[in-house]
């Protein structure tokens, strides 16, 4: 397919505004109150949305990252999309899913996915970042397992302190969109 990244980004923005953004009174996972909510799952669990996110994230991955990971459930479709598209592009980056709690049976592990060597570089993916709490939990679990987290990539940064929380850990945050991008698009339509 001969699609420009700018066109893919615009298409994803339109999908997010149509299918993920909701106005109203909400309590976020951080406990904060908000006048809007962004649920990316209707987008990232659709075939086209998964493709768009996967392509755009794959283009941003550092060459040294051998895997992508994220906290279940929001990051599950993200890591799978990037991993599958990486294989099609000849890059073969593994997908890791980080559990919120250790599995209560079998291996009792926090991380599901193919085994990687100690020191393997992993990029954490997140759908929506507010304070960064969910992604930081994934970062901690990955570091405890002996992996090196090089950065966090998000779909939407709500600009609620997440970037500062990652910076305090020495981990860069990059996002496909800021909340201001969604607001500007919604104001135009």
UniProtKB/Swiss-Prot annotation:
* Family according to the record: Belongs to the purine/pyrimidine phosphoribosyltransferase family. PyrE subfamily.
Pathway given in the UniProt record: Pyrimidine metabolism; UMP biosynthesis via de novo pathway; UMP from orotate: step 1/2
Q: Which reaction does it catalyse?
A: orotidine 5'-phosphate + diphosphate = orotate + 5-phospho-alpha-D-ribose 1-diphosphate
State where orotate binds.
130, 158
Question: Which keywords does UniProt give here?
Answer: Glycosyltransferase, Magnesium, Pyrimidine biosynthesis, Transferase
Q: Which CDD domains match?
A: PRTases_typeI (cd06223)
Q: Entry's InterPro entries?
A: OPRT, Or_phspho_trans_dom, PRibTrfase_dom, PRTase-like
Q: What does the entry give for GO biological process?
A: 'de novo' UMP biosynthetic process; pyrimidine nucleobase biosynthetic process
Is Magnesium included in the keywords of this UniProt record? yes
What is the uppermost EC class here? transferase
Function (record text)? Catalyzes the transfer of a ribosyl phosphate group from 5-phosphoribose 1-diphosphate to orotate, leading to the formation of orotidine monophosphate (OMP).
Q: This protein is called what?
A: Orotate phosphoribosyltransferase
Concerning HAMAP family, the annotation shows: PyrE
Query: Which of this chain's residues are annotated to bind 5-phospho-alpha-D-ribose 1-diphosphate?
Result: 99-100, 103, 105, 126-134
Name the needed cofactors. Mg(2+)
What GO terms are given for molecular function? magnesium ion binding; orotate phosphoribosyltransferase activity
How does this chain assemble? Homodimer.
Domain of life where this protein originates: Bacteria
The answer to keyword Magnesium applying to this record is yes
Q: What is its EC number?
A: 2.4.2.10
